[in-house]
């Protein structure tokens, strides 16, 4: 019997603009509140988020990357509820949980609190995170597992007839489409005949920039994918005061562009040829340092409009982080079902990000070719015209990615 995990993610950002701005003290509070995995793994002894990023980057060094650390960590934590022996230990250690300093119960309570916080109604942007369990009628799930999924992870549960594969796919795809506001449709193209349980985790985020980019300032410019490959992209521009820093140790520049509400997009531009150096230096400590050292600076910011999608078979990636047992015939998932032959055969993760002047999908790049205007005195020009990194943070790292080719 096979257990499938589908992580269905969508990020739409930003849309529109507001008139208020972040005060420096608000950014300082974000640093103090930022969990960067602390909610996921109390007393963490490793950076799961950044280890996973490096594993994905290593597997496809020339491709763009986009994923949600919160969503993947939550899915693994849910799995650990039903895992036993070495299977559970691998998952918890892979997440970085030090069981000598914190309890497994703290992990699940942390996620319960995170779900409640992230799903609170907010002004200026939409953020929802949730889980669902689709179970075949022939499978007996452990009552304790179902109860924990409902109480700790607020999961919806649905009886599903997997023998009717077309009907099961429609049921699951319709649910995913509804939760992602129609952004992800037909997630399942086919369904394994041995499937008996499907766990779904989704996150939806749609935000407005605090100050939008002017469509009239968008212009076609060169983007240097490599020294040999140059593509034309619609480049947005806006002169304003931004949170900014130059990290000389990692040879990169970091700028924070706030959304309405409490979320911020961080864009990291490595110096030429220094992408791998920056990737190797990513850590919770590094991110905290960046946020703490931000200073307001007048910048003329040039940022490409882009849309990238990340789709990953995590059963092929997580073993490099020490999480392998759950994907084999040796898996102990006795806490999910009393069937001895149940294992996770597939763990699918899909994420989409769209960034433009206002977040409207229908907005198109202008066909007019402009030239860069001269920057004002005391205003520094920062042009993202080569591969860069992107974070979306809201007390936690919601999304992390690399834009290799917009």
Curated annotation (Swiss-Prot):
Residues 1-19 form the signal peptide. Its main location: secreted. Disulfide bonds: none annotated. The record marks 373-374 as: Reactive bond. One of its GO terms (molecular function) is retinoic acid binding. The reactive center loop (RCL) extends out from the body of the protein and directs binding to the target protease. The protease cleaves the serpin at the reactive site within the RCL, establishing a covalent linkage between the carboxyl group of the serpin reactive site and the serine hydroxyl of the protease. The resulting inactive serpin-protease complex is highly stable. PANTHER family: PLASMA SERINE PROTEASE INHIBITOR (PTHR11461:SF274), SERINE PROTEASE INHIBITOR, SERPIN (PTHR11461). Forms protease inhibiting heterodimers in extracellular body fluids with serine proteases such as activated protein C/coagulation factor V/F5, acrosin/ACR, chymotrypsinogen B/CTRB1, prothrombin/F2, factor Xa/F10, factor XI/F11, kallikrein/KLKB1, tissue kallikrein, trypsin/PRSS1, prostate specific antigen/KLK3, tissue plasminogen activator/PLAT and urinary plasminogen activator/PLAU. Forms membrane-anchored serine proteases inhibiting heterodimers with TMPRSS7 and TMPRSS11E. Interacts with SEMG2. Belongs to the serpin family. Heparin-dependent serine protease inhibitor acting in body fluids and secretions. Inactivates serine proteases by binding irreversibly to their serine activation site. Involved in the regulation of intravascular and extravascular proteolytic activities. Plays hemostatic roles in the blood plasma. Acts as a procoagulant and pro-inflammatory factor by inhibiting the anticoagulant activated protein C factor as well as the generation of activated protein C factor by the thrombin/thrombomodulin complex. This is Plasma serine protease inhibitor. It comes from Homo sapiens.
């Amino acid at each position: 019997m096979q257990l499938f995990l589908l992580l269905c993610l969508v990020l739409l950002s930003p849309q529109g603009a507001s008139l208020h701005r972040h005060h420096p003290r608000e950014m300082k509070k974000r640093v103090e509140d930022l969990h960067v995995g602390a909610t996921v793994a109390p007393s963490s002894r490793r950076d799961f988020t950044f280890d996973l990023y490096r594993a994905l980057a290593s597997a496809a060094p020339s491709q763009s990357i986009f994923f949600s650390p919160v969503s993947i960590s939550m899915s693994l934590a849910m799995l650990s509820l039903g895992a036993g022996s070495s299977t559970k230990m691998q998952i918890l250690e892979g997440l970085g949980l030090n069981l000598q300093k914190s309890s497994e119960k703290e992990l699940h309570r942390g996620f319960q609190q995170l779900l409640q916080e992230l799903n609170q109604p907010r002004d200026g942007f939409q953020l929802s995170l949730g889980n669902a369990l689709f179970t075949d009628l022939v499978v007996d799930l452990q009552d304790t597992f179902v109860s924990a999924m409902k109480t700790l992870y607020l999961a919806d549960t649905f009886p599903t007839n997997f023998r009717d594969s077309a009907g099961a796919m429609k049921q699951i795809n319709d649910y995913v489409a509804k939760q992602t506001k129609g952004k992800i449709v037909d997630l399942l193209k086919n369904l394994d005949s041995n499937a008996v349980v499907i766990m779904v985790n989704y996150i939806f985020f749609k935000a407005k920039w605090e100050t939008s980019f002017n469509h009239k300032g968008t212009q076609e410019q060169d983007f240097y994918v490599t020294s040999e490959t140059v593509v034309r992209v619609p480049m947005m521009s806006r002169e304003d005061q931004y949170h900014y820093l130059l990290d000389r140790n990692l040879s990169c520049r970091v700028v924070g562009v706030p959304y309405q509400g409490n979320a911020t997009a961080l864009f990291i531009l490595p110096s030429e040829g220094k992408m791998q150096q920056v990737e190797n230096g990513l850590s919770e400590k590094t991110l905290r340092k960046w946020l703490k050292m931000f200073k307001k600076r007048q910048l003329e910011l040039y940022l490409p409009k882009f849309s990238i999608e990340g789709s990953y078979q995590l059963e092929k990636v997580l073993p490099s982080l020490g999480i392998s047992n759950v994907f084999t015939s040796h898996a102990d998932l006795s806490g999910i079902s009393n069937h001895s032959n149940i294992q996770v055969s597939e763990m699918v993760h899909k994420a989409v990000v769209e960034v433009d002047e206002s977040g409207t999908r229908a907005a198109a790049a202008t066909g007019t070719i402009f030239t860069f205007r001269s920057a004002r005195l005391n205003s520094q020009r920062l042009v993202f015209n080569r591969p860069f990194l992107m974070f979306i943070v809201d007390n936690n790292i919601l999304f992390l990615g690399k834009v290799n080719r917009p």
